[in-house]
Amino acid sequence: MKIFTCGDSYEDKATCIYRAWEYALGLGQGAAGHGEVKILREPIAQLDMFAEYVHIDGEQDIAEKFTRSVRSISPVVYRNVFYALLSDCGEAVDAVYRYLILAFREGRRVEHMLIRPEAMRVMELSRNVSNESHKFREMARFTSVDRKVYVCHIEPKCDVSM
């Protein structure tokens, strides 16, 4: 098993998914298959003794390719993937990877396949990020500093400061 690790930004996560997909399809060497790939966000709490770890840094052009590919499925799939990648959940990147395996196979029908655990998990992550974003937009309270600047202090769990 090969475990790909990445940082916290969208670019890092998108690049990591792209590189893991390349490895699974065996571009450049023998095909490993999607079952031999796992993606984790750093820092990693507990290492697997029998797995090989590969750190992936974000690359803007790869992240753009990833985004174009996901958008080609459907706008709803792209929104769900984007929001899920903003989640604070440690398994979100791997959940998106498993969802995209299904999404590229099924196309836009994946939007309605909530019986599948991969689709349901990404929908849950997306909904949680969307709800938290809405909550902070709705409940943000600003205070005036010297009647010149308004300041609001928020501490979201997910990366909702988009």
Each language-model region and where it sits:
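N-terminal ordered "arm"
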Residues: 1-58
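Conserved aromatic-histidine-acidic binding/catalytic patches
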Residues: 2-10, 117, 152-158
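Charged, alpha-helical interface segments at or near domain boundaries
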Residues: 40-137
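A contiguous, surface-oriented mixed alpha/beta subdomain in the mid-to-C-terminal portion of proteins
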Residues: 115, 124-162
